């Protein structure tokens, strides 16, 4: 009751504060951005020209010392008879390594644009070859150029660079006896609300910027001076799969998470779009998607920002929601229905490593058959630059990051507002709505040939289900399911996800159960449904959730499990008001889950079973905190005569084995990697991926390894564990997790080895606990007379003190606690990662 009252008080406080402060926040978020007059250089000229809404100053006519260039060995060409824009009529030529230097006014993210033109007919210009690099606290290889590869149209190469020094230099280096050239340069600071995720390293080279469904937008019509090209039909795999739509309505910039501002993209982008075009000859009961295919560098990391604004729907309801796919593997929910008004612009950010095909596909897909929801307004795609000067593409980074953009409200930045935002964050975490951006979802919307644009799949019927031939004796009548769930009463709903919904139920014999019901008629999850039944029907283990039965009557897909009283491991680590688990309890839970996975990996008559979706939400706890691994819908059987399995990538983002992502080869070691991420969750009590954290902290495993290299692991530990962990126990536990997270599978331990190591960690902890108990007893016995100091047992192997128990190190270095769910259900919960 006290908790309920507290929740109501919090809700009332939030409501009042939102009403008071929202006008200021909204004004701050949507205020008009004015591009700063930093540096606009007209190279090779002594005169100023106006272009793209800015005045470009001649590089020989600068009245300040803020811009300088290497004058030795340079040459100038001035062709005023050209019909090209005026900034392209002059060019500065370098025959030796040369540079432009800028004295910046501020650090942080900056736009850098280099303008090139080959309108001059000189032979040495047409054969010029040179490279461009930049330095501002770190070096960046920007681009290698050869004008002979360009058209006669002037080209602008745009970069987003993080400036770490006020001294910024752009270097031009001709190849051998060739030369370098430049027509104009722009350097200016980006707006504060332009957030780039740390997963991209914040140093980017723009390769595509499209006004989808609309005309070309010139720099004069963009507050940031960008050029938006129309998405020609060349990008669409099937030209008739989409139609252009446009609107005269002014975009409603509302501010907030993932919401766009007037500087995110021009109004014109949000007034036009391409929408699904379901032709009259489409068969009834089909899922549909539309795909844009882009030529990119192979095996290279890309940052993609996708723009949306619902100018299509008449009503804000779930019928307008659809899926966004990246390269056919990763799915994220796009929910226009969650926007407060129609025509409210928002965006999704993605970081993706391209495969070896040289193509990167972006798709929108329907959620339900016979629906044509789905649209796209704009797209920006940028290559990631490394700080060391080479392209950023390494095997350990072969993963997709789905990031929620954030518009920063600077005008109302007070302590009260920060408190409000934090409470709103907790409120969001408590709500039933899931965050699909956090956990990537695997689904292949495309046909087997690359670049496909449509997947027309009839809704499956289950009359020929292979389960009927297994004679499992696990079928439960649908009438019993209805009775157990009180006709699927929403009051009994305890979880939902990509497959369907989970209900707490009482079976006719009085047994508690968790009933998972697939989304009726969606045609999704059939294979997962059958796989889970086939896997669970052949295994029984103390640390694996048992399947009680299933039902497939009336095209239903219903699974019935034993009821796990204490819910998921995740709920006991973060995101709820449950009491914190002790370090000993956490170790015992890890050992139990490891034993369950080891049992799966132990070859049976048909082969080992690879779980393929190990995560903290798939480890459940019974009333005695006994851990059991759950959710086998993605599991695969691995025969002993196969070295590995080559399959499409499935799983949950944040837990995916990088080698599996790179090669599509699945082994038991993929489960080991995911379990290593779970070990980090257990120790640091935070999600594998949390887009609400600062960019460098979003990915748990990467952040932990960074902190380990800096010797700051103790600063990010779960505060509730401070004073509990014995030094050697912590050290050994981190060693196990690090081994599990090795880049290559053959470097990782088996689950059997992990069990042994975890049991050793538990022994280390228990020895310390017993020693401390003995010391307390000795002190108590001697308290009747003069106090006798306890005799400490010291050895070379074990420390008598936790590294967090004494002195300043025991202080809680966190500024907040994570308490975000108002109600905890005991069940089998489904995440949206399917």
Swiss-Prot record:
Question: Where do the record's glycosylation annotations fall on this chain?
Answer: 61, 149, 221, 246, 277, 289, 314, 352, 361, 394
Tagged with keyword Cell division: no
Q: How does it sit in the membrane?
A: Single-pass type I membrane protein
| Positions on the Cytoplasmic side per record topology | 427-834
Task: Name where it mostly resides.
Answer: membrane
Q: Per the database record, which ranges form the Protein kinase domain?
A: 488-761
Q: Which residues lie on this side of the membrane: Extracellular?
A: 29-405
PROSITE patterns to which the protein is assigned, alphabetical: PROTEIN_KINASE_ATP, PROTEIN_KINASE_DOM, PROTEIN_KINASE_ST
Q: Where in the cell is the protein located?
A: Membrane
> Can you tell me which residues form the catalytic site?
613
Task: Write out the similarity annotation.
Answer: Belongs to the protein kinase superfamily. Ser/Thr protein kinase family.
- What's this protein's name? Probable receptor-like protein kinase At2g23200
Origin species: Arabidopsis thaliana
